[in-house]
From Swiss-Prot:
Part of the tripartite efflux system MacAB-TolC. MacB is a non-canonical ABC transporter that contains transmembrane domains (TMD), which form a pore in the inner membrane, and an ATP-binding domain (NBD), which is responsible for energy generation. Confers resistance against macrolides. It is found in: Cell inner membrane. InterPro entries: AAA+_ATPase, ABC3_permease_C, ABC_transporter-like_ATP-bd, ABC_transporter-like_CS, MacB-like_ATP-bd, MacB_PCD, Macrolide_Exporter_MacB, P-loop_NTPase. Gene3D superfamilies: P-loop containing nucleotide triphosphate hydrolases. It is an enzyme of class 7 (translocase). Belongs to the ABC transporter superfamily. Macrolide exporter (TC 3.A.1.122) family. This is Macrolide export ATP-binding/permease protein MacB 2.
Amino acid sequence: MTGPQQGKILLRLENVSREFITGEQTVRVLNNINLTLHSGEMVAIVGTSGSGKSTLMNILGCLDKPSAGEYWVAGRIPQYLGSDALAELRREHFGFIFQRYHLLNDLSARENVEIPAIYAGIDREERRKRAVNLLSRIGLAERLDYRPSQLSGGQQQRVSIARALMNGGDVILADEPTGALDTHSGNEVLNILKDLHQQGHTVVIVTHDMSIAEHAQRIIELKDGEIIADRPRDHAQEKPKMVDIPSVIDIPSMDEKISTGAQQETEIARKPLLTRWKVQYDRLHEAFKMAILAMAAQRLRTALTMLGIIIGIASVVSVVALGKGSQQQVLANINAMGTSTLEIFPGKDFGDMRSAAIHTLRDTDADVLAQQGYIHSVTPTVSTSVTLRYGNKSVSGTVNGVGEQYFLVRGYTIAQGMAFTRTSVNDLMQDAVIDENTRDKLFPNGETPLGKVILLGSLPCRVIGVAAKKQSGFGSDENLNVWIPYTTAMKRMLGQSYLKSITVRVNDDIDLANAEQGVIKLLSQRHGTQDFFVMNTDSIRQTIQATTSTMTLLVSMIAVISLIVGGIGVMNIMLVSVTERTKEIGVRMAVGARASDIMQQFLIEAVLVCLLGGSLGVALSLGIGLLFSLFSSNFSMVYSAASIITAFVCSSLIGVIFGFFPAKRAAEMDPIRALERE
């Protein structure tokens, strides 16, 4: 292949100056630089330390902007472009080769080479194929999956060269490319750069070593920020002895690429691009992978960061589960009193000292209530405490005089025998239904109680049924209870004609509050005054639900504090991560990452930390619930899909909210400052 001819103007600087402010002083690093570079040239910029050569290279590569003057890249003026447009220029036209390689330690050689193509939106398989091809041609086919720490300096610089060529690399900017290499490796790198020049690339070498500069077609000397010489290489001078290596890259010349006056897409960019959503998915996939690698590289720190999120999420989910469990338990206890029931008592309220003297609740009131269309069933109630006897067994218990519908109203189940009937009530029959506690006390040896006669005080009654035990939070389920017809209790035991209370069960399709008003109105008319009060079980239920919800919310707010503390911990660690990975951010920006790409990278990492912490928090909460159920048989934590989904949503929001500032800080970094930071 013949050497390239000088092409059209590619890069041009007019009166470019660059100043930096240090404290109260202004330092001019470049002073009125006028320079034109044509496509296909191989140029060396040489100068001692402090001459401004690196600053000039940064301006050429759109990593920095001039303080004065103008700079053109293929007709475009970078200093008037936004950060994303500058990223596009770097991505599509420039390839950087750094003295210290600037490879990402967590990625393999192939993955390092692929980075520019990720930001260019190239298909995963296409960029992988391209990276393998580039590395194979520069002699690294056997080290595709090696990490930078497993490669020699020369091999790392070759990877850096392949990365510079990934998107085509119209202009290769090499900053001291042999500075950290031995002579043999340095000569190999120079051979590759010269070969790239022969292939049509514009190559700019920045060096302090004139022997390196002599390999270029054109040498530009800088001193104190000014060009003191711009000359072609002296062909009469003996060329340094080089190591002969084969041509490595086969790319169309720059003359072909800009013959129409506009930059054409490189070989890889000519391939069909993915649809917009798939490109975004690919970037998200790579960002996710990098987040995993970053977390894995700092396992202990990641675990400690997640600890606050784990505790916070576990606390919130557990508190909600405890709240729901306690609420369901209390509601079950209320239901044990009877569903949709109204309790009618004499007096104005519980604790009314005059209630004992009010004897206006009668069985006729119960009969009238039973005739109302909105009433499902009614049972009068009287009660007294007596001694229960059978044979030589004597225990204290409660005798309840009730109607035949009592067990239906209260939701009791008859485990043995039967309940008494309306006939038993009308005929004052001495039939009794006992509970399981009474059965166990009076008939401890498993003897059937049915048909047996027991003494309730001095009143003998025949046992016709056994009611199953019923858990209730409003009184102990260990009480001994016996139920007999209320007429029998009133006439043969108590000698009274008034009732202790009336329990009314309302039809399921009737609003309990309306039924309550109906009962109050009816009984007030019968009594001539309201000398009674009504307890609405729905009111109790609503009050307890509201109280439970309030307590759950209160404790949840305390748990949310843990989440906030965890979120602050995530933000702190992400800020540390941004500081530690400043150079990585600079490298990504140099190869074409937009500010949004950098922000997305760190946001995904923050969200991933929080989501993983949230998952572990939910798992911890479920484990707590399992242990809780082992130690508590009559109460359990109740988990809901809504609370778990909410936990994950909260985790994501914490990641976004507390990860936004560190991610924004990373995205707003100046690429050249990031690259220079040690």
